[in-house]
Amino acid sequence: MRRRIRSIAALICISVAATGCGSAAEPTASGGTYRLLATTSVFADLARLAVGDAVQIESIVPAGVDVHTFEPSPSDAARIASADLIVANGLGLDAWIGKLLNAAGKRGDALLSLGEALDASDGWIYLDADASGAAGGAHDGVDPHIWLDPKGAALYVQKIAARVSADRPDLAVRI
């Protein structure tokens, strides 16, 4: 178990270091390039772990910018409008994504809210934000920082891979 957790943590570190080093996604026989837009660079990195270079991946919040204080712009709504899948954490972390989806005229089924996609069947137990020791009390209820736990990050990677494979079965062989 420890070895597996270390491996996942190492993969996350490598993906963060390699951000931007991959090649562009290519169109496939059954459709154009699949565009995945993540709310943060962290979730974009997890998406790269999940799907490699099979899809085009970008993030809304630039690296180094705090998701808690980020203010989306009209250009972000335009980026959402052209995305096939929007990957967010949910659980109140990137609460602005709902308004951005509406502004872009995007349906809710284009959103994969990772934290809300996990449940007991995944072996995940949510921590109360107060019990977790989350600094500042910025979140009500559940602690949304699931990806900080290697098991949580691995579950996020699995959820992203499963969703892209379901959306585009032609890409599943490349994932």
Show the residue positions of the predicted features.
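Extracytoplasmic metal-acquisition and chelation regions
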Residues: 2-10, 17-174
